[in-house]
Amino acid sequence: MKNKIFHTQEWRIIMLKDNLVTVQNNIVKACEKCGRSPKEVCLIAVSKTKPKEMLMEIYDCNIRQFGENYVQEMVDKADSLPKDIVWHMIGHLQRNKVKYVVGRADMIHSVDSVRLAEAISNEAIKKKLVADILVEVNVAGEENKFGFKPDEVEDFIRKISDYKGI
């Protein structure tokens, strides 16, 4: 039998698919352990710094949820890739970039201040939509990381609970 030499892109696709199956199997096993349905788990493919072509390879494996760390990359990808992709902004978000994210990201995972929540709320109201957000919590208390201390979360949620648009 002849040795088959794979083109680099073909090999990458095989590895991506293999890794995806491994991750999906790990999700199923973890869910079985804790009595949870795997359908309740959302697998988000983190696309930071990856080219659009690679995202399309994962997209072709029926993955529709993508997470991006950088605003400009998310904007470029969201505006040029298929519209059924669900985008998650998972990186630190600065208030001056909120206008680019609200309306493109289906979920903002990194709300770490009242001022950022206000900016998201105001932009969502302007665009007549609701922006889904998650609160970033710095559970390890690392100085170089963003997020609320665990004991600050409840107060933050109370402060923003009446904000429209989020």
Identify the meaning behind each predicted range.
Residues 12-166:
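Conserved alpha/beta-domain cores
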